[in-house]
Amino acid sequence: MIIKPKIRGFICTTAHPAGCEANVREQIAYVKSRGELKNGPKKVLVIGASTGYGLASRINAAFGSGAATIGVFFEKPGSEAKTGSAGWYNSAGFDKAAKEEGLYAKSVNGDAFSNECRQTVIDLIKQDLGQIDMVVYSLASPVRKMPETGEVVRSALKPIGEPYKSVALDTNKDVLVEAVVEPANEQEIADTVKVMGGQDWQLWMDALEEAGVLADNVQAVAYSYIGTDLTWPIYWHGTLGKAKEDLDRAALAIDQKLKAKGGAAYVAVLKSVVTQASSAIPVMPLYISIVFKIMKAQGIHEGCIEQIQRLFATKLYSGTAPDTDEKHRLRLDDWELRDDVQNTCREIWAQINDNNINELTDYLGYKAEFLRLFGFGLQGVDYEADLSGEVKFDVVELV
């Protein structure tokens, strides 16, 4: 079939296998261009490894420091006549590139919240790697099936206390609209913390520790976003912020346990990027379009792969203990939060309208980046080619 993008809401329902592979190879090339990370990790588990920051972490570990990697994700394979998910094709592309270089790469496709998935990963580590020296936790899921009860809990993207009203971008019609989001109730807040907070990360770390598969000096990191006053009402001061605060709590608890073996756990606060997760949050597409324009003009723009390369090289594996903020977090959002960047952001925000959106923001860049997530718009890819949606690779299927 000839595969074209089909957009529904903030999701692209198709993905291009060759385009996704090309996207992965571009990221690999960037990591290699930065040189080898001499004292980087060697045996790495990435939970949430198929897109965005998780995929970028797996690529940096493997191609920046020659690490053996195990990636966990929940993705959909394709068939002859139907495309799979972008994360499936990304992971297949990663697997192929890793094998070409003789790097160990195993993938587990299943529910990362389940005890079965944890046990499968532990067995794999024991069998193939013995122990791991890094754990990356990068899950972005709207639902969590509780491992003990089977209860399905859903997260909510909502403000707390009062309705949220703001200008936002309708990315289907390319016009500005007023977004109105009603506030969350107590149950929705609690459920969002259960799904997107630090509880599951702790379950993973406890299970890995009890199984004896964490090496001395193991580094554990989970990813977060704080943002600015433009996004706080819907994000940091909303249900998601409560979940991310719980991630901070978990990091301190995990860090205390890992200290005994010379290890450490951190939350890394990252910059805003175009991901399948961020495109679902009202206001983020508009904010990202503005901040991209400013940061590109100043030569400080980063995508997922650049952010994680900087995290590894300058924070986690620089050879010295990394600087943290007052909450023990690693801050990679430092360039985005510079006063000059944010002040310009606010100025543009105040004057934005349907007529000047492409002039004042990088909305065209945002849209191109969004399509790239699904393998569309990459150089050197024949988008008129007749392709099968079926791509096989070395993956343990728990689905």
From Swiss-Prot:
E.C. number: 1.3.1.9
Species this protein is from: Serratia proteamaculans (strain 568)
Class in the EC hierarchy, top level: oxidoreductase
Keyword Coiled coil: no
Pathway assigned in UniProt: Lipid metabolism; fatty acid biosynthesis
Binding site for NAD(+): 48-53, 74-75, 111-112, 139-140, 244, 273-275
A molecular-function term among this protein's GO annotations: enoyl-[acyl-carrier-protein] reductase (NADH) activity
Annotated site location: Plays an important role in discriminating NADH against NADPH: 75
Gene name tied to this protein: fabV
UniProt keywords, alphabetically: Fatty acid biosynthesis, Fatty acid metabolism, Lipid biosynthesis, Lipid metabolism, NAD, Oxidoreductase
GO biological process: fatty acid biosynthetic process
Pfam families attached to this UniProt entry: Eno-Rase_FAD_bd, Eno-Rase_NADH_b, Enoyl_reductase
Record's protein name: Enoyl-[acyl-carrier-protein] reductase [NADH]
Keyword Transit peptide: no
Reactions listed under catalytic activity: a 2,3-saturated acyl-[ACP] + NAD(+) = a (2E)-enoyl-[ACP] + NADH + H(+)
Family: Belongs to the TER reductase family.
InterPro entries: Eno_Rdtase_FAD-bd_dom (IPR024906), Enoyl-CoA_Rdtase_cat_dom (IPR024910), FabV-like_NADH_b (IPR050048), Trans-2-enoyl-CoA_reductase (IPR010758)
Subunit-level organization: Monomer.
Catalytic residue positions: 235
Function in brief: Involved in the final reduction of the elongation cycle of fatty acid synthesis (FAS II). Catalyzes the reduction of a carbon-carbon double bond in an enoyl moiety that is covalently linked to an acyl carrier protein (ACP).
